[in-house]
Amino acid sequence: MTRPAARTRRQALNELLGLVGLLMGGGLLAAQGSQTLAARPVAGAANPPAARPSRDPATQAPARRDAIGTLDRNLITAASAGDQALVSRLLAAGASARAADEHGRSALLAAVQNRRTEVARTLMLAGADVNLKDADANSPFLLAAATGQADMVRLALTHGADLSSTDRYHGTALIVASQQGHVEVVKLLLKAGIAVDHVNDLGWTALLEAVILGDGSARYEDTVQLLLDAGADANLADREGVTPTRHARQRGYKTMVKMLMRVRGH
C-alpha cells in the first residue's frame, strides 16, 4: 500500500469514528439501559424462586468481559439507535458483529431491545449470534419472543435460533411468548417444532403461563387453543397439583374452560 493510500484509509476511519462521537455527543443514540426478561410476574407469590444458572453455558455471556474495542462499542450504540448506515460502515471498518460489552450485551441484543429489525438483519448476516446471552440470561432470540417481535423471531429462526435455549427461569421462547399472549410468535415457534410441554423453574408450562399470567382476553384464548392444537397436555398440573382447567375455572375464564374440557382437561 502506498503512503497516500494508507493516509486516505486512516482519514476515512478517523472520519467514521468522528461521526460516532458527534452522534453520541448530540445525545441521539439510545442509552444502554434496557428491558430484560429478569422481572417475570409470579401469580400468588411475592418472591419468585431464585434463578438457576443457564442450561446452555456455551452461549451464556459472563458477567464481565475484557474491555471491547472502540469500533465494537460504537457498533452496539449505533445498533441501539437503529442507524443502519452507520452499522454497515462500522462493520466494514472491522467491528465485530459477535462482540459483547462488559454486561454481555451484543449489538444484536441492543437492536432487539430497541426493535431495530433491519439493523438486526444486517447484524445476523454479518454473523451475530442470536443465542448469545447477557449477564441476565437474555438472548436476542428469547427477548424477541418475549416482546412479541414476530419478524425478529422469524429472522432468528432462520439464523440458528436454539429452540431449547432458556431464560433465567429455565423458560423457553414458547413459555415467555405464551405468558404475554403473543399469538403470532407462538405460531412461529410451534411451527418450528419447539417443545410444547417444557416445564420451567416455577413448575409451569406454556399452557399454565397463558392461563395463570394472562387476562383471559381473546389473545390468550387464541394462545391456549394454539397450544392445545399442538398437543399441549391439558392435565399437566403445577407444583400444587392445580391443572390449567382448574386455574381457568378459578379465574372465571369460561371459554378457556370449554377449550380445555374438549381435550379432556379436568
Mark where each language-model region is.
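N-terminal secretory signal peptides and thylakoid transit peptides that target proteins
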Residues: 3-20
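N-terminal segments that cap or nucleate solenoid repeat domains
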Residues: 56-106
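Ankyrin repeat A-helix N-terminal signature
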Residues: 77-82, 110-116, 143-149, 176-182, ...
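Ankyrin repeat structural motif
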Residues: 83-91, 116-124, 149-157, 182-190, ...
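Leucine-rich solenoid repeat scaffolds
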Residues: 234-265
